Structures are given as structure tokens and as C-alpha cells.
């Protein structure tokens, strides 16, 4: 069974942040979360995250997850020293018989398919993930013999002129037999320009011990890009968003402009979905067949039924929208909003913890909170469900086929019967009976000949 070690102890000084570097987000989740997802896709027996700077915050973010443990590296003396801190946990049980894969918490986008290719290249030996770069400055170089076999890795600061001319570089990611890895880590030294214990030094030891060292390459160059600064974080964000957009396009989604699309979670789309510019999708979002999302909308943890249109500048969070519905523009669906098929929610309407039944409409300037609204109900402009008494929330019930006039306040708890009509301007404090007109306002009167006051000189 596979062990995975994730190195996440670095300070991230260039990030200029109090937040541990691996907790900075990419596409809506911490970088470490991306690495953990890829690692879990391999179904390892254990994952050990090596923490250091900000250890308490990193552990708190992922504590309690099955198969995940932490090892502390303090102080930090290099990547080899970091892996040494995980060795005791790797050797527990039958761990010594396993292989260990080493990943990095600030290299967030290495894909499971690439890691499987690396595992396949290993055989019974060691495999390193390498890449050929036009400018290899700053990277460790892969040194091969005349037969093309990997013999060692030399860090840039320790490389001579001939070695610096090599374009194949080490990404840092490798897999090795656990028992041998433990032995090699005890034999490395810090006799180098940095005065650190390099994990890469195990390659020369493996070769000296007659262990085959193989190499594999990622499918895309962005998979092995690390993040050490805000600029690199922003660059990698755009590269990953471009990849996510490409995947949506290949799945049949129409994106008005792939460069202005942001997916910060999972986005599942049916057939013939159209997404306009500037939209943001967070958490888990599911769009049914034929859904159209207008420009600059935000959808977070939302399910949208087939044929529904979300108009411009609408914000939906933890909500469900049925088939053939209309939402927006400038609508807000808050947590617990549940719209039935063919429901309409128009501009400047806010719905929270409420059901709007099939073919019901709230087209203008309304607040509907803690309400159960039946089918074919018309909610007039300016309607408010007064659901909060200062301490507790109360529900409003509006039955099928009711008509709620404009500028109406429903003071919960209150019920509007089936087919009832509330006259415009009504403040409802008691239940309104079915099939009746209910109104509460003073009788209109006129004062003939009344004059407005005149400003005194």
C-alpha cells in the first residue's frame, strides 16, 4: 500500500502574509487541499503532512480527516530533513514494505494521472517527476549517464557551468521504497551551498546501491508550478482557470469568454448550457440541460433545473431552482431558497429559507424570508414578510393561487388562504381567509380647496 508525504512546513516569506503559505487559496480552496485531493485519488494507506510554520493553523484546517496525520519539522533544515520527520509514522505496521510518494503543499495542481504515470515508471525502484524547461534557472538539474539513466540531481546553487546547461529539471516530486528511503535519509549530509539536507541527494545513493532511478513527465507544465509569491499565485490561478474552462468547453458548455470564467469548486453541466462573461461558480454547482447564466452572476452550492435562465448580476447561495424558472436580473437567493418549476424571481428580490411554488412570481422589489408559498401565487412589488420579532424567526404561509398586492407587509406568523387576495398597502397581522379580499388601510379622503403652505417672506 502507498504512503504519501506532503511537505507543508515552509514559511512563505514572499507571500507577505500571516497565513501559512499552504492555506492560501487557489480556485476556492487552500493549496494543500488540492494536493490532498490528488493524493487521495491514489487511495494511499496513509498521508503524513509535514508542518512547521503555522503548524497549529494547518493542523486545525484538516484535523480529523481519515488516514491523515501530521509530523512537525521545527526548525527547518531542508526537504530531506522534512521527510525524516515523517519516517516514524511511515514505518508503523507494515509501512516499511510500502512505497512512499513525496509531494509539496505549495505545488497544488499535480494531477492524479501524472502521479499514476510516475508510479508506473518506478517499477521496484525510484522514480522522479522531471520537466524540460527552456530556462532552468533556479531548478535542480537531472544528471544522466551516457546510457540516459538518471544518476543524480544537483541543485542550481551547487551546479557547475556544464550542469547548469542541462534543461531537464527536478520538480521535487518522487516515489521510493519506504525502507530504502529511510536508510538513504540517514546517509545524506548538509555539505552544500544552503547548508541543508536535500531530499534529492537520495538519488545518488540509490544509484550507488544499484537501485534503478526512472523519470516521468507531467502532461502539462502548469502541474508542477509552485507558489512562492502573490504574483505566482495569481499566475497559477489563471492557468488553472483556463484549464477548467477548456474542460467545460470540451464537455459541451458554451462560455461567452473562457478568459472571464471562474470555477472555484465543482461545476456539473447538462447539455447546451450557456455561461456569459464574469460568472463565478463556488462549492458544488449543478446546472441542468439548457440553463443560461447571464453576465456577472455568482452561484455557490446551487442546483438549477433544466431550461432555467439566471439573468445578469444575480447571486445564488445554497439554493435550488426548478425547471424553466426565471431568476433576476439583480436577484438574490440566500440559503434555503427553493424555487419550483416555472417560478419567476425578478429584479431586487431577496429570498431566504423560503419555498416559492410552481409558476409563482415575485417580479419586483420584495423580501421573502421564512415562508412557504404555494403554486401560481403573485407576489406584488414591495412585499415584505416580516419574519423576525427581534428574537425569533416566524414563518409565513401563502397557499395556492393567492394574490399579494403591492406594498404589503405580512407580519409572521400568518397564513394566507387558497385563492385569497391581499389589497395593495395591506399590513397583515392575522390570517387571511381563502377566496376573500383582505385589506387594512384607512379610507381615502379628499380635502377640497386645500392649499400648500407658502414660504414666509
Swiss-Prot record:
PROSITE patterns: HEXAPEP_TRANSFERASES. GO terms for biological process: cell morphogenesis; cell wall organization; lipid A biosynthetic process; peptidoglycan biosynthetic process; regulation of cell shape; UDP-N-acetylglucosamine biosynthetic process. Acetyl-CoA binds at residues 381, 387-388, 406, 424, 441. Residues 1-230 are annotated as: Pyrophosphorylase. It catalyses: alpha-D-glucosamine 1-phosphate + acetyl-CoA = N-acetyl-alpha-D-glucosamine 1-phosphate + CoA + H(+); N-acetyl-alpha-D-glucosamine 1-phosphate + UTP + H(+) = UDP-N-acetyl-alpha-D-glucosamine + diphosphate. GO terms for cellular component: cytoplasm; membrane. Residues 252-457 are annotated as: N-acetyltransferase. In the N-terminal section; belongs to the N-acetylglucosamine-1-phosphate uridyltransferase family. Homotrimer. This is Bifunctional protein GlmU.
